[in-house]
Amino acid sequence: VVNASVAEWINYTSYDRYRLAKTGLRLSLKQFRLDRMKGYLEDLFRYGGDLFYQEHKQRQVYKRVSALIDLAGDHKISHLEDVLMEEDLYSFDLGTEACLSIAGMVEYVREGYNGLVNVYPFTCMPSITTSAIVRPLMNRLRVPYLDAAYDSSTQPGREAAIRTFMYQADQHFKRYGRHGS
């Protein structure tokens, strides 16, 4: 079981600001607006520096903690953007954490996981977007997938859906083995 960490979201926000500064700088260069170029250049260094520092500290913490517990590392945000562009599934330009979820799930499939569950609060648009893109992809890749939207109600058929998913994940494991082995 792997959960995305809060650090991944924090890194994403810095990366998104870095991307916006890069885009603004490019546009300012094309329009030759020196006053705007200076501001975007400052933002580029600020957010790039923040992201570098955050990733560096995260690696240090994960290195120490992983000696004590089995902890999966987060994906590098720039790598997730590359995955989305490579697969042509979604664009970081649209924003929201859907870009993290979609690319992260593609990476987990590449790493050999035997099933994926998308757990989200009921009516969360980024997760609904993720589901709309990932469900057909997982069907095509023949990887067990379950959407689990939660609110305060009891949903009929939830237990059956979970049992079915677990059975499919077990069959996938028997057919393809454990990831990383």
Task: Tell what function each PLM region has.
Residues 1-181:
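An N-terminal assembly and electron-transfer interface module characteristic of large anaerobic redox
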